């Protein structure tokens, strides 16, 4: 085999990573798919299984835990994109950060759990960015500054 053929084979492998890894369901003994999602300092652990569509977050219903409709809409986005609303019972434990960060973490975890349960859904979720970890976190405070970037008030005289 010549060098050119070897490089062509390597190029085809690296350009299409999805072809190298076959899609396999990741389901536990109870028939659930599990995934973790993260956003800011929030970490969500998500379990999904076929059911009537109930969403339980930290032992409470989603309407109670996330009172703002915008946050509930954020969580439902992966289900709407994949047309799986009302088909899965979802149990979530989430901690850290605020409500907005927690909702983002739940959305990330739910998207990953859906792809573990049905690997074919990855193509629908990936373009919307639901499988990508949002790496933006709060910038740290620096010494000699009031906040991360804000300086103390300057007095000329």
From Swiss-Prot:
Gene Ontology BP annotations: translation
GO cellular component annotations of the record: cytosolic small ribosomal subunit
SUPFAM superfamilies, per database record: Ribosomal protein S5 domain 2-like
GO MF terms held by the record: RNA binding; structural constituent of ribosome
InterPro entries tied to this protein: Ribosomal_Su5_D2-typ_SF (IPR020568), Ribosomal_uS9 (IPR000754), Ribosomal_uS9_bac/plastid (IPR023035), Ribsml_uS5_D2-typ_fold_subgr (IPR014721)
Keywords attached to this entry: Ribonucleoprotein, Ribosomal protein
NCBIfam families assigned to the protein according to its UniProt record, in alphabetical order: PRK00132.1
Database matches in HAMAP family: Ribosomal_uS9_B (MF_00532_B)
Family according to the record: Belongs to the universal ribosomal protein uS9 family.
Entry protein name: Small ribosomal subunit protein uS9
Native species: Caulobacter sp. (strain K31)
């Amino acid at each position: 085999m010549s060098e050119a053929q070897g490089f062509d084979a390597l190029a085809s492998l690296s350009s299409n990573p999805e072809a190298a890894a076959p899609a396999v369901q990741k389901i536990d003994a109870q028939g659930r798919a599990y995934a973790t999602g993260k956003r800011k300092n929030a970490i969500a652990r998500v379990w999904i299984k076929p059911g009537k569509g109930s969403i339980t977050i930290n032992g409470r219903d989603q309407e109670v835990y996330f009172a703002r409709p915008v946050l509930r809409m954020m969580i439902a986005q992966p289900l709407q994109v994949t047309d799986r609303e009302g088909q899965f019972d979802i149990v979530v434990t989430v901690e850290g950060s605020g409500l907005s960060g927690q909702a983002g973490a739940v959305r990330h975890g739910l998207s990953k759990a859906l792809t573990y349960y049905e690997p074919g859904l990855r193509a629908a979720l990936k373009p919307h960015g639901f499988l990508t970890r949002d790496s933006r976190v709060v910038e740290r405070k620096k010494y000699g500054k009031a906040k991360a970037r804000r300086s103390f008030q300057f007095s000329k005289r």
